[in-house]
Amino acid sequence: PRLETIIMEATYGGKDDNPPARRESEEELIKIIKETIEKKGKVLIPVLGVGRAQEIMLIVEKFVRNKQLPEIPVYVQGMVWDVTAIHTAYPDFFHSNVKKAIFNKDQNPFMNSVFKHVGSQKEMQEVIEGGPCVVLATSGMMTGGASVEYFKALSDSDRNAVVLVSYQGPGSLGRRLENGDKDIRISETETIKVKLNVFKLSGFSGHSSRDQLMEFVKMLEPRPKKIILIHGESSKCLELASAIHKQFRIETIAPRTLDTIRIR
């Protein structure tokens, strides 16, 4: 076999980019939800509509079913609900544990009674004015959509919490919250003072950690002549490119947008 060039991601290419184990993040999420609910607050979880939202729903449902989390309402905003309905229509593609629950026990986790659909502005306002709950809404980086509207409504109370479970891109509202900003400018005329609690959980990422990326390169046989790093912030691509070159003596490239590269 011949291996000439590898194109690989560098989302978590920084030297300290090794997220905690998935189980740790699951337990931390449930802990945050419990503590916030006990304070009579609300938990906003901005999610990616496809994939991440359904993962969080499965986690919450599991802990509710096992009596490790009280049966508080989990409000699922518009698009997330629609995408989840498509997931539910194709159970054959689920993880084996979920398939067994559906086919052997007639328990579809996505149809648990804790999940409530929010489909209108009026219903959203009722959620905001109502009691303790969890809210799943897009967009995951809080660049727009219902997650921003919920944030604006919930940000003025330290009883509430926002839990960031996705990557937050530079310049996004989510990244500013992640960085600890307490005065968030939403528009020319609107600035939000952040009083709610902000949590970042990295263990839900669908991307490989720095160690996993380095291990992948180590296992390549034969060694490629060239590795091109993409899908990451410029600093992450450069850091990973440098580390790979230093450890494996492979030519690495961290191209900028619109750069042209000759493969051979």
Placement of each model-derived feature along the sequence:
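Acidic/His-rich, metal-assisted hydrolase cores and their charged scaffolds
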Residues: 1-264
